[in-house]
Amino acid sequence: MTPVKVFGPAQSTNVARVLLCLEEVGAEYEVVNVDFTVMEHKSPEHLKRNPFGQIPAFQDGDLYLFESRAIGKYILRKYKTREADLLREGNLREAAMVDVWTEVETHQYNSAISPIVYECIINPAMRGIPTNQKVVDESAEKLKKVLEVYEARLSQSTYLAGDFVSFADLNHFPYTFYFMGTPYASLFDSYPHVKAWWERLMARPSVKKLAAVMAPQGA
């Protein structure tokens, strides 16, 4: 079987989200780099894969997909096994909870944590743009409120959708991994159930493999 292709560097949070799903299900894949320095992401060839000129793009035979969470769901459906059932679509109640917390990650958690990662890591290191402390402070306060909700939820269940790991949990990995390299990582210390949940995620073989790829060189 021809391996699927993922277009974009593994260090990208959105690409890493896709790769994590592939690792969880044990699928063969090939990572195809997209060179941003020469604007390859805006090339006609790449725009055929992702019309918005972004990453990731995904190829499975003659099927092309974009948007990392949609790609992740496709992967988890295609390669679903009893051991790798991360969408729980055979159980209406469980699937609904996976959907709820996937939406929460997208609209609440990600919107709070990603600006901190951008301002503390991406903008200064990759773009030469100084950290905007006002954005960081506002996002940190927003993140605290989100983590309060997570703490309450995770005091009742091992993972977000229930006592089983799911797509909803995995989606949190890329940005949280980079967040833990910022001066604000200690925020998690105030939320013991959230911190324990994160440590459980970090112990997964798939997560360990991606973390090694995403870690800064020399770290």
Curated annotation (Swiss-Prot):
GO terms for cellular component: cytoplasm. Gene3D superfamilies: 1.20.1050.10, Glutaredoxin. Its EC number is 2.5.1.18. One of its GO terms (biological process) is glutathione metabolic process. GO terms for molecular function: glutathione binding; glutathione transferase activity. SUPFAM superfamilies: GST C-terminal domain-like, Thioredoxin-like. Induction: By the herbicide safener fenclorim. Residues 2-83 form the GST N-terminal domain. Conjugation of reduced glutathione to a wide number of exogenous and endogenous hydrophobic electrophiles. Belongs to the GST superfamily. Phi family. This is Probable glutathione S-transferase GSTF1. It comes from Oryza sativa subsp. japonica (Rice). The lineage of its organism: Eukaryota, Viridiplantae, Streptophyta, Embryophyta, Tracheophyta. The gene is GSTF1.
